C-alpha cells in the first residue's frame, strides 16, 4: 500500500469508527485492505464471500460517505476476494516465468525467484502459533529445522488431522529461514500443485525446467503429500527430486494427514525415505490450548469477547483450530448482524446448528461393525473371526473401509478391532473397496446408505 493511499484509508477509518459499533468496525471494516485507487474507484480486498456480501449491502454507502468527507470527491467502491487476487497474482507470476524462459542460465536451469517465497502466508509464523501439549513436539521439531536447515532433521514429516496447524508450521519454517537468510531459495507447494505442474511439464515437453525448479532449491515444503499416493508418475518424479535434494544436503519438509506407514498405495521406497528423518504428529488441542487459541484470535482481530463465551466455545468445539476460530467469527458476525452484545446465550444461538451436529453420537469401529453385520445378517464375531469365506471376508473389508473413512483410528488400531489383523490387511481392504466403488453402483448405494445411518444417529 503506498503512503498516499494509506493516509487516505486511515482518515476514512477514523470517520467510520465513530459511526458504528466497535464490534461491527473490527469485524467488517477492518477486514478490508485497500488495493488501489484511481479514476474515482477504490478497490478493496476482503477475506471471503460472506464478508463481501455484508460490506456490499450494509457498509458500502458508509465507506463512500467517509471517502467523500476526506477527499471531497465521490468514489465508487469495488470489493475483491483475497483468493481471486492471489490467483491473479499466480497467473501474473506464471507469465513472468514464461517470459524468463529464454533468459535462463546457460545450462538451462531456472532460477527460483523471490516470487516463489511470496506463496508463504504472512500470518503463519512461529510468533502467531499457539503452543500446547497437543502440538509442542511438532512445534519444537519445526523450530529446530528452521534454525538449522538440513542439519537437525531431514526430512521433517508432520502429520495430523485437518485444521490442526500443520500448514501453519510449514509456513513458519519458511518465514524463519528467509528471515535469517533472505537469499535462501524456499519453495512451498501443495502435492496437488506439484502434480499439476508435472502434468503440464509433460504435456508441454518442459520436463527439464520442472526438475530444475524443484531440484535447485534450498528448502522444499510440500503440503498434503499423501495425495501423491496412487499417482505413479508423480511418485517417480518426487522420488528423484527427494534424492537430488537430500544428496545436496537441502532441507525437505512434508505434511500429511497420517504417518508414512499408513498412506495407502505409497511406494515403499518413498515410505522409507519419509521415515529417514523425524516424524512429528499434531493432536487435537486440549481445553487449555483451545482457550489460548481463542484469546490469541480475539487479540489479533481486536475483538472484545467475554471470557465465559470463550469457555463456552472451547467446551463445545473440540475437533480442530479452524472450526474453533470459525465459531468465534460466527458469533461476532451474529452479534453484529442482530445488534446484540456477545454473551453465552447469543453464542448458543449462533452455534446451535454446529453444536447439535457435533454432539451427535460419534462413529466408532464398533458401530460400523454393528451396521455392516446387520446389513449382511452376520454377527460381529464373524467380522472379527479368521474365517475367509467370501460371504464374511467381503463385508469385513467393507467394515474396514468404513472404519478408515469415518473414524480417526490408526490402521494398526483398526486391524486390532478386526481380530488382531495387521495394518497392511486394512490397507488392502481400503484399496480394494475404493477400486470397486468406481464401477459397482450397488456397492456405492450400500456404502452411502450405511454411512448416512451412521452419521445421522
From Swiss-Prot:
This is Chromosomal replication initiator protein DnaA. Its main location: cytoplasm. One of its GO terms (cellular component) is cytoplasm. Pfam families: Bac_DnaA, Bac_DnaA_C, DnaA_N. It comes from the Bacteria. Residues 119-335 are annotated as: Domain III, AAA+ region. It is found in: Cytoplasm. Keywords: ATP-binding, Cytoplasm, DNA replication, DNA-binding, Lipid-binding, Nucleotide-binding. SUPFAM superfamilies: P-loop containing nucleoside triphosphate hydrolases (SSF52540), TrpR-like (SSF48295). The keyword Secreted does not apply. Plays an essential role in the initiation and regulation of chromosomal replication. ATP-DnaA binds to the origin of replication (oriC) to initiate formation of the DNA replication initiation complex once per cell cycle. Binds the DnaA box (a 9 base pair repeat at the origin) and separates the double-stranded (ds)DNA. Forms a right-handed helical filament on oriC DNA; dsDNA binds to the exterior of the filament while single-stranded (ss)DNA is stabiized in the filament's interior. NCBIfam families: DnaA, PRK14086.1. InterPro entries: AAA+_ATPase, Chromosome_initiator_DnaA, Chromosome_initiator_DnaA-like, Chromosome_initiator_DnaA_CS, DnaA_C, DnaA_dom, DnaA_N_dom, DnaA_N_sf. Domain I is involved in oligomerization and binding regulators, domain II is flexibile and of varying length in different bacteria, domain III forms the AAA+ region, while domain IV binds dsDNA. Residues 336-457 are annotated as: Domain IV, binds dsDNA. Residues 75-118 are annotated as: Domain II. One of its GO terms (biological process) is DNA replication initiation. GO terms for molecular function: ATP binding; ATP hydrolysis activity; DNA replication origin binding; lipid binding. The gene is dnaA. ATP binds at residues 163, 165-167. Belongs to the DnaA family. Residues 1-75 are annotated as: Domain I, interacts with DnaA modulators.
Amino acid at each position: 500500500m503506498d503512503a498516499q493511499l494509506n493516509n487516505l484509508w486511515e482518515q476514512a477509518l477514523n470517520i467510520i469508527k465513530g459511526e458504528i459499533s466497535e464490534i461491527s468496525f473490527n469485524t467488517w471494516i477492518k477486514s478490508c485492505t485497500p488495493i488501489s485507487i484511481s479514476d474515482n474507484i477504490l478497490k478493496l480486498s476482503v477475506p471471503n464471500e460472506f464478508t463481501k456480501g455484508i460490506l456490499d449491502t450494509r457498509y458500502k454507502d458508509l465507506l463512500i460517505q467517509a471517502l467523500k468527507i476526506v477527499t471531497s470527491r465521490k468514489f465508487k467502491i469495488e470489493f475483491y476476494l483475497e483468493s481471486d487476487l492471489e490467483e491473479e497474482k499466480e497467473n501474473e507470476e506464471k507469465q513472468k516465468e514464461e517470459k524468463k524462459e529464454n533468459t535462463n542460465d546457460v545450462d538451462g536451469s531456472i532460477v527460483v525467484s523471490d516470487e516463489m517465497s511470496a506463496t508463504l502466508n504472512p500470518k503463519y509464523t512461529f510468533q502467531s502459533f499457539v503452543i500446547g501439549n497437543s502440538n509442542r513436539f511438532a512445534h519444537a521439531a519445526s523450530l529446530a529445522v528452521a534454525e538449522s536447515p538440513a542439519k537437525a532433521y531431514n526430512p521433517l514429516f508432520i502429520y495430523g488431522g485437518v485444521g490442526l496447524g500443520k500448514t501453519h508450521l510449514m509456513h513458519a519454517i519458511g518465514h524463519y529461514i528467509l528471515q535469517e537468510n533472505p537469499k535462501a531459495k524456499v519453495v512451498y507447494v501443495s502435492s496437488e500443485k506439484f502434480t499439476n505442474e508435472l502434468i503440464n511439464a509433460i504435456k508441454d515437453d518442459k520436463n527439464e525446467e520442472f526438475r530444475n525448479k524443484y531440484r535447485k532449491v534450498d528448502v522444499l515444503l510440500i503440503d498434503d503429500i499423501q495425495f501423491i499416493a496412487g499417482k505413479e508418475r508423480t511418485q517417480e518424479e518426487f522420488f528423484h527430486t527427494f534424492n537430488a535434494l537430500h544428496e545436496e544436503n537441502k532441507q525437505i519438509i512434508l505434511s500429511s494427514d497420517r504417518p508414512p506407514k499408513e498412506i495407502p498405495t505409497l511406494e515403499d521406497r518413498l515410505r522409507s525415505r519419509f521415515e529417514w528423518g523425524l516424524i512429528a504428529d499434531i493432536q487435537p488441542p486440549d481445553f487449555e490450548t483451545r482457550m489460548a487459541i481463542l484469546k490469541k484470535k480475539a487479540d489479533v482481530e481486536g475483538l472484545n469477547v467475554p471470557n465465559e463465551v470463550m469457555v463456552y466455545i472451547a467446551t463445545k468445539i473440540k475437533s480442530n483450530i479452524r472450526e474453533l476460530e470459525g465459531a468465534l467469527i460466527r458469533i461476532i458476525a451474529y452479534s453484529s448482524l442482530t445488534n446484540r452484545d456477545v454473551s453465552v446465550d447469543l453464542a448458543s444461538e449462533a452455534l446451535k446448528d454446529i453444536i447439535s451436529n457435533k454432539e451427535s453420537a460419534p462413529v466408532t469401529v464398533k458401530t460400523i461393525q454393528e451396521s455392516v453385520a446387520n446389513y449382511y445378517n452376520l454377527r460381529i464375531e464373524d467380522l472379527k473371526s479368521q474365517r475367509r469365506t467370501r460371504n464374511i471376508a467381503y463385508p469385513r473389508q467393507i467394515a474396514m473401509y468404513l472404519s478408515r473413512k469415518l473414524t480417526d483410528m490408526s490402521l494398526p488400531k483398526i486391524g486390532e478391532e478386526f481380530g488382531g489383523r495387521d495394518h497392511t490387511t486394512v490397507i488392502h481392504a481400503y484399496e480394494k473397496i475404493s477400486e470397486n466403488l468406481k464401477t459397482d453402483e450397488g456397492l456405492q448405494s450400500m456404502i452411502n446408505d450405511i454411512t448416512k445411518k451412521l452419521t445421522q444417529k
